Structure formats: C-alpha cells, structure tokens
Amino acid sequence: MLEEPGLITFAQTKIQPPRLRSGLIVRAALERNLHGALASRRLTVLQAPAGWGKTSALTRVLSQLPTGHAYVWIAADEDDDLQRFLACLSAALEPLDLAWRIAPRALPTLALAERGLRQVADEVANALASSEIERGTLVIDDAHRVKDPRVFELLRLLLESLPAPHWGLALSTRTVPDLPLARWRALDEVAELRLEDLRFDEQDVAALLAANGVAPDIASELARRTDGWAAGLRLLMSVGGGMGHGRSAAPGQRHVFEYLADEVLSAVDAELRDFLLRCSILPELTPRRCAYVAQQPRAGLLLERIEREGLFVVLLDAEERTLRLHDLFRDFLEDRLQRDHADELPGLLRRAAEHEPDLARAVGWLARAGAWEEAAQAMAERGPALVPLGGGPT
C-alpha cells in the first residue's frame, strides 16, 4: 500500500550532506575531474563498491563549489518508494524558493495519475528553469539502495527535461544505475568515475597517513595491501597500520573482515556468495578455471556479474575475461571458506592444482590440501624441466 502523501515523514539528515570527515586530504586529479563533471555534464555517476570514498569525494567537492553553483542532497534508503522519494525531493528543493506551478507537496499524488511520472518530471524541470541559479546539481547518494524502478524511470524523464546547461544530476552508487547510459555516453552527456578514479595511490596514502599523524614509511605497503581501498586504509590505520601477512586475520584486518561481511558478502545472493567463496583460492579468475574448480557451469555469467557490480575485482584481461580479487577481499573470502566449508577445501585445492601451469603454486595448493603424494609426484614429473630455467621452487 502506498503511503498517504500527507503522512510521509523522514529524518532531515536525508536531505543534508554528511559533515566533512576530519583527516581528508586533497586529491587533485579526482577533485578536478569531479568538479568538471558537476559543472558541465547532465549526469555524473560515481560507481564503486562499498568503502571506496564516493560520498567523501562528493561532499568534499560540493563544499568547494563556487557561489553560483547550488545543489540539493538526497541520501537514498531501501524503503524509498516513489512517493517517499518525491517527498524528499520537494523538501530538498524548498530552500531554493522555486516558482512552482503546483504545490510541491502534491508531487507524490500527481505521480499516481496516468502519465504521472512525465507530469512530475515536467513540473520539477519547469520549477528549476524558473530559478536564476547559474548551475545546480541534484545529488542522490547511495542510489543503489533504491529498489522502486519507478524512481529510476522518473530520473530518466527528469534528466531528459532538465534545463540545460543549468542543471545536472549526480549519483553515487555501488551498482550500474538503471538508466540509458550508453545513449548519453554517445552524446557526451555523462561523466563516470569508477574504482580506478577513486583508488588511493602511494602518494595519496602517504598524504593520508601524514594528515592523521601516522608515519608515512608504511605508505607503500598499505597501498599494496589495500589496493588503494579507502575503507581498508581507514580501518588498518585505526589499529596502527596492522598488516597481517599470514593467513590468519591480524587484529586490524578483523575490522576489515567484519566490514566486508556486513557491507558486501551479505548483500549478494547465495549462488554468487558460494561462487566467490569457492573461487577465492584462485589468484586469477577465468570462466574455464572457475567453472572447473567451483563446479559451477554458470561461471562465465557470474564473473560478468562480479565485474559489472564492481565486487572488489580488477580486470586483468578483457579478451579472456580474467579478473583478480582485491587482496583484502580474497583474504576475507578464504577465511570464511575455511570457517564455513573446511570440508570442501581439499577438493577445491586439488582441482585448482590440476591444471595450474605454475609448479610452485600447484605444489603449494596440494600441500595445503594434505595431498603430499600428489605434490611429490608433481615435483618429480615437472620439477626437473624447470631447473635449467631457474624456475623450480626453492
């Protein structure tokens, strides 16, 4: 049942950007690109998994906008249906003192009429066009939380109606939004910032450490260990930069594991979760290898989904679709695999070793599986051929 528009209530924090976090650093390239996108594009999309600093980047850049650039903020929630979203939107726009043709509080009711979404989009666009604002941005934070498809249909219609070049839309999201991005890319009307743009490099990590009173001598190792993941950096820094090179979780990494469990693994369905766990022993993921090791005939489709949803992976080879799991995520998955499916681990390791061209890696997996005879046989059969090349294990 839809809520009566007059009864829709929400916390004011939904339409207020979060306060800037202390210890943030200047990230010139990222901020320059985001500034440029917000100033000129019809749509700006920040897409990356949990904890990559999407909201922090947005709030920092919004705080630096010139006087003539206005913005409104909506933090999306799972229970935001169309009526609730429109109530938030009208409340967020209220401080701009727009010239509405209808009362903005009537938007949720108008949306229920025939062709209501088109009418709502036109009313909002006309109200925005009536303002003397030089440039404005509608910001939807955590857009992936919205489950009502009508909200994205409204956003599509609104994007087509926004008064250009004065207004644009910005989304932060963990998944690809349900919008016609391909068409807008062709028209050069969308700017997309992804994981690669948000990743902290070694210089960023050193600056972050210095800003938080931590010696920068561990910057290189932290950058490598976290792969530039903002949340991982914060969590490891909070416990003194614990690195934990062993297979068991160091105290600092336990915080990372808990975060991953809550924010990532619990959000995917059982099929994808089991696939990730069973493939976590592999340093590189390909459809053929994952299908064999995990005994999952849908491996190719699942890998496409993992890449599409940005689940802490890096694309190594587009032609063969070879992915690499983020180190911390892989550590977490292996830890969970050992805890919840220890009985399956020997079989997974044996299958992984069976077609592994790297002898040292194959022998290591067989040793972990307790398959000592098979490990010795692999050494006897393949080891001598590698000695002249200096490739044998030591």
Per-segment meaning from a language model:
Residues 6-9, 13-14, 26-30, 56-60, ...:
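Alpha-helical sensor/transducer elements of the RecA-like P-loop NTPase core
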Residues 62, 86, 90, 94, ...:
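Short, amphipathic alpha-helical segments that act as regulatory/interfacial helices
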Residues 141-142:
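Walker B catalytic acidic pair
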Residues 1, 44-52, 58-62, 157-160, ...:
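C-terminal boundary/linker of central alpha/beta nucleotide-binding cores
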Residues 52, 56-135, 145-147:
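Conserved phosphate-binding/catalytic loops and adjacent sensor/switch elements of nucleotide-binding enzymes
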Residues 342-394:
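Extended alpha-helical scaffolding segments used for macromolecular assembly and cargo binding
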Residues 208-210, 220-225, 231-244, 274-278, ...:
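C-terminal helical "lid" of AAA+/P-loop NTPase domains
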Residues 2-50, 56, 60-61:
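Walker A/P-loop-proximal flanking segment of P-loop NTPase domains
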